[in-house]
Amino acid sequence: MIDNAKNYHEKMFPGYVSDFLRTDPEFIEAFDNFAFDEVVNQDDLDDKTRFISILAVLLGCQGIDEFKGMLKAAYNFGVTPVEMKEIISLCL
């Protein structure tokens, strides 16, 4: 995995190791390089704004489980609990 992707993944999900590393290491390497390096370096959004957008979209599409999973990652990138509450209230 590319170092940038590895560092970004670790900041988002500290200590998390995907089961795909064992079952399909080629797939997870390609996916991680795409998701955690190419995508995040493709636009002009700062990380905090990106995570605010991700949280709002997940609520908007009723992706509640995914939303819960991304809360800690968003916090790791600077989204505050007050901002998280605001996102939730705006999506109601």
Task: Give a label for each model feature.
Residues 68-90:
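A cross-kingdom feature marking solvent-exposed beta-strand/loop segments within repeated
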